């Protein structure tokens, strides 16, 4: 699809990884390197992010999920595993609601069904205000610090900063609007896919109540909690994260 960059590596059954707010496909590097030996790994840059930064950004989770489904249809990928992180986890919940029959196994990772994000380190509206007052670079850096136990000393912190820098102010604000206005709680009961829920116990973006809402309402779900991890488990404990996902998928 025009202006949408999709990294496509490896061979085998398709595994689609959807990044979150201020992210990009580059943030999946440890996963791409690991999974491409067993899977065809599909990692899109969402519209307005990464190498899709020339594409028009969206202010609705539903419209982003429609776009991704269209992209997969265009690539003739009719059946796939699907993993979404953070805002990407909201997107994959909506994709499962619309096209659950196309999804073999689903992973909801460091995400939740409530867009207002109760218990977040700051409200979504505060993040919007910070964007306006402090600018994108400072706001993105401050947010990324909360994604790791070690903050900016974390090994993969710079990947997150580089991804954030490729994002425009308009895209960042539109994403926050999309997050705030989305609520997927009522649709969870309709997700019939075998689902793995992954969460770090020090996550400052999505609290335990959000995770438990997923677990209690998705019928065929299993929860795995990583100890001493914040929001970006896949970059804090990549080896254990990758093994956990592989064991679930195979």
Please report, for each region that a protein language model flagged, where it lies by residue.
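Conserved HGGG/HGGXW glycine-rich cap/lid loop of the alpha/beta-hydrolase fold
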Residues: 4-54
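Active-site loop/oxyanion-hole signature of alpha/beta-hydrolase fold enzymes
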Residues: 33, 42-83, 243
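Gly/Ala-rich beta-loop-alpha elbow adjacent to hydrolase catalytic centers
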Residues: 84, 88, 92
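Flexible "cap/lid" loop of the alpha/beta hydrolase fold
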Residues: 93-98, 103-134, 138
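Conserved alpha/beta-hydrolase catalytic His-Asp/Glu region
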Residues: 116-122, 133-189
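Short beta-strand/loop motif that positions the catalytic acidic residue
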Residues: 191, 197-199
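Acidic catalytic loop of the alpha/beta-hydrolase fold
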Residues: 202-206
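Catalytic histidine-centered segment of alpha/beta-hydrolase-like enzymes
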Residues: 229-238, 242
């Amino acid at each position: 699809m025009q202006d949408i960059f999709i990294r496509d590596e490896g061979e085998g059954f398709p595994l689609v990884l959807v990044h979150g707010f201020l992210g990009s496909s580059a943030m999946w590097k440890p996963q791409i390197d690991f999974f491409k030996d067993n899977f065809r790994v599909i990692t899109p840059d969402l519209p307005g992010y990464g190498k899709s930064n020339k594409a028009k950004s969206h202010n609705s989770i539903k419209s982003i999920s429609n776009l991704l489904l269209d992209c997969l249809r265009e690539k003739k990928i009719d059946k796939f595993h699907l993993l979404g992180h953070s805002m990407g986890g909201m997107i994959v919940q909506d994709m499962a609601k619309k096209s659950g029959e196309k999804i073999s196994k689903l992973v909801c990772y460091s995400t939740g069904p409530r867009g207002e994000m109760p218990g977040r380190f700051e409200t979504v509206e505060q993040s919007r205000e910070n964007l306006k007052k402090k600018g994108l670079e400072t706001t993105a850096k401050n947010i990324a610090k909360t994604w790791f136990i070690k903050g900016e000393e974390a090994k993969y912190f710079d990947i997150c900063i580089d991804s954030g820098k490729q994002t425009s102010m308009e895209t960042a604000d539109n994403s926050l609007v999309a997050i705030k206005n989305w609520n997927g709680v009522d649709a969870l009961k309709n997700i019939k896919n075998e689902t793995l829920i992954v969460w770090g116990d020090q996550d400052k973006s999505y609290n335990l109540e959000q995770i438990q809402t997923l677990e209690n309402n998705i019928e065929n779900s299993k929860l795995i909690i990583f100890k001493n991890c914040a929001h970006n488990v896949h970059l804090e404990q990549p080896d254990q994260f990758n093994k956990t996902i592989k064991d679930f998928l195979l």
